[in-house]
């Protein structure tokens, strides 16, 4: 297991007690590793790809707990790189538009939100949760015991 995967697994185990922190974390996860598809007025689908199983479980459990969203999971293994990929899809559901609005990703009648909305990161705890989610979605950390490199 890579050093980055170990760090992500450790971050997933950080207890989230406040709903606003879980919202901020899920918002970052979707913003960084998600793809939003629009299928007509008010009809959306979100697709998230991750290599880490614990991150996939976090997205599934948070979206279910916060918004009662169903998520389909597809597991693929890359032959060339010998890595796992988890493909999560939240297809068009009644509460998906409301969820995207609460996560600060989409505003009905206005469109996609650029930047990080202040409503998502009001407190220091929510800001930390947002950064944690962004790292879990697309971060990399080199093992400090090995050679360093710059990306």
Predicted regions and their residues:
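Intein-associated homing endonuclease modules of the LAGLIDADG/DOD-type, together
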Residues: 1-60, 66, 114-151
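A generic, well-ordered mixed alpha/beta core segment in the N-terminal half of proteins
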Residues: 62, 66-115
């Amino acid at each position: 297991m890579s050093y980055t995967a170990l760090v992500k697994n450790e971050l997933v185990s950080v207890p989230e007690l406040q709903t606003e922190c879980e919202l901020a974390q899920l918002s970052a996860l979707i913003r960084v590793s998600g793809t939003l598809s629009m299928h007509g007025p008010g009809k959306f689908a979100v697709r998230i790809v991750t290599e880490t199983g614990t991150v996939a479980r976090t997205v599934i459990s948070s979206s279910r707990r916060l918004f009662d969203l169903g998520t389909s999971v597809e597991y693929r293994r890359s032959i060339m790189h010998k890595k796992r990929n988890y493909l999560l899809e939240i297809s068009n559901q009644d509460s998906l538009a409301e969820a995207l609005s609460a996560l600060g990703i989409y505003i009905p009648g206005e469109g996609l939100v650029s930047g990080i909305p202040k409503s998502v990161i009001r407190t220091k705890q929510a800001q930390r949760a947002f950064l944690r989610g962004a790292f879990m979605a697309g971060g990399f950390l080199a093992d400090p015991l090995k050679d360093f490199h710059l990306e």
